[in-house]
């Protein structure tokens, strides 16, 4: 809408991606801050609370009455702010919005199932969830594959030229990236604000990378591929704004949890951003906390099945530190620090080619 107004009313400033990204940020922030307290009151009145896993550390039992599914609010705020701000002729931006819609549907269904049965493990069956994730990820990947100006090459940090062209196999690789990142963020969302800030730092990094990739001069200077994805930085900025508003209520002690509605959607969106910006490998550094949390689960399960011994006191790894009697705030802030430093390093690698 804003881009349309810039052309109709000749308001040139609204044609700039940076201006519309800033507007989208504040719109999403405002929508979230306005809607979230109302959602919290509604969730409390309808007992839409977070079911606590019986195996979780004892301190988690005090969170049993905390409303969940807050992700629906900030994802809605993001989509609304994006629709107001993006240029609809840019298919990459449209794809970004569709990614948010698709995976929020999965998360919503999962949250509703848990709330109805009042059981943390009673959400969608793992097989059902994987089928839905694969279906939506496949739709998004095929959509990208059909775009004429989007290549299927794999880029790695420090190299100015692509490693190789994946061809049609890129579709399957992208599906894995989206699903893996979606589930990784979901695993991380176990403490107040733990997944929120690393998501914000990752989104900020991708916003910068996407803006550079979409700019001919800047991408040429940094020896990066030039793809017309600049508009997606607007959607990413909107989600940063929405998450900033959500953090106001999600910081310790949390008044609301994002639920799978938020975590699965954020993860899938980060995967989408990594794919379109040709940063699939760099995603491992940008999303370092999500990678660490996921690896801890893989190691724990693998070790127990092979050796009947556990590597950690409990997985994901943030629970391990809880079992070692670390204060929740200490775990959260230290993970935030790691996430921030990882993203700074990731951005530095852009100059080293």
From Swiss-Prot:
Pfam families: Glycos_transf_4 (PF00953), MraY_sig1 (PF10555). Its cofactor is Mg(2+). GO terms for biological process: cell division; cell wall organization; peptidoglycan biosynthetic process; regulation of cell shape. InterPro entries: Glycosyl_transferase_4, PNAcMuramoyl-5peptid_Trfase, PNAcMuramoyl-5peptid_Trfase_CS. Pathway: Cell wall biogenesis; peptidoglycan biosynthesis. It is found in: Cell inner membrane. It comes from the Bacteria. It catalyses: UDP-N-acetyl-alpha-D-muramoyl-L-alanyl-gamma-D-glutamyl-meso-2,6-diaminopimeloyl-D-alanyl-D-alanine + di-trans,octa-cis-undecaprenyl phosphate = di-trans,octa-cis-undecaprenyl diphospho-N-acetyl-alpha-D-muramoyl-L-alanyl-D-glutamyl-meso-2,6-diaminopimeloyl-D-alanyl-D-alanine + UMP. Its EC number is 2.7.8.13. The chain crosses the membrane at residues 13-33, 66-86, 88-108, 130-150, 162-182, 193-213, 229-249, 256-276, 281-301, 330-350. GO terms for cellular component: plasma membrane. It is a multi-pass membrane protein. HAMAP family: MraY. Belongs to the glycosyltransferase 4 family. MraY subfamily. Catalyzes the initial step of the lipid cycle reactions in the biosynthesis of the cell wall peptidoglycan: transfers peptidoglycan precursor phospho-MurNAc-pentapeptide from UDP-MurNAc-pentapeptide onto the lipid carrier undecaprenyl phosphate, yielding undecaprenyl-pyrophosphoryl-MurNAc-pentapeptide, known as lipid I. This is Phospho-N-acetylmuramoyl-pentapeptide-transferase. It comes from Sulfurimonas denitrificans (strain ATCC 33889 / DSM 1251). The lineage of its organism: Bacteria, Pseudomonadati, Campylobacterota, Epsilonproteobacteria, Campylobacterales. The gene is mraY.
């Amino acid at each position: 809408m804003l881009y349309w107004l810039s052309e109709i009313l000749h308001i040139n400033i609204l044609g700039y991606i940076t201006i519309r990204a800033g507007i989208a940020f504040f719109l999403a922030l405002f929508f979230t801050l306005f809607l979230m307290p109302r959602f919290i009151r509604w969730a409390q009145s309808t007992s839409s609370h977070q079911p606590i896993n019986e195996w979780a550390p004892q301190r988690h039992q005090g969170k049993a009455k905390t409303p969940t599914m807050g992700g629906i609010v900030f994802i809605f705020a993001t989509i609304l702010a994006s629709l107001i701000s993006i240029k609809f002729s840019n298919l990459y931006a449209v794809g970004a919005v569709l990614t948010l819609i698709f995976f929020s549907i999965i998360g919503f269904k999962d949250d509703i199932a848990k709330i109805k049965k009042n059981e943390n493990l009673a959400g969608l069956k793992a097989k059902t969830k994987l089928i839905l994730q694969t279906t939506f990820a496949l739709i998004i990947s095929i959509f990208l594959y059909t775009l004429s100006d989007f290549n299927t090459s794999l880029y790695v940090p420090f190299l100015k030229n692509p490693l190789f062209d994946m061809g049609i196999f890129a579709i399957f690789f992208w599906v894995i990236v989206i699903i893996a990142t979606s589930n990784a963020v979901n695993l991380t969302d176990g403490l107040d604000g733990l997944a929120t800030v690393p998501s914000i730092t990752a989104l900020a990094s991708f916003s910068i990378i996407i803006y550079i990739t979409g700019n001919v001069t800047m991408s040429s200077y940094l020896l990066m591929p030039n793809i017309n994805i600049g508009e997606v930085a607007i959607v990413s900025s909107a989600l940063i704004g929405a998450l900033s508003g959500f953090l106001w209520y999600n910081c310790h002690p949390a008044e609301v949890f994002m639920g799978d509605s938020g975590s699965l959607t954020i993860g899938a969106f980060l995967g989408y951003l990594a794919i379109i910006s040709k940063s699939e490998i760099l995603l491992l550094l940008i999303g370092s906390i999500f990678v660490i949390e996921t690896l801890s689960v893989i190691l724990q399960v693998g070790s127990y099945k092979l050796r009947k011994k556990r590597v950690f006191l409990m997985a994901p790894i943030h629970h391990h530190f809880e079992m070692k009697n670390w204060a929740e705030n200490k775990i959260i802030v230290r993970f935030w620090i790691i996430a921030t430093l990882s993203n700074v390093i990731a951005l530095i690698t852009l100059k080293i080619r």
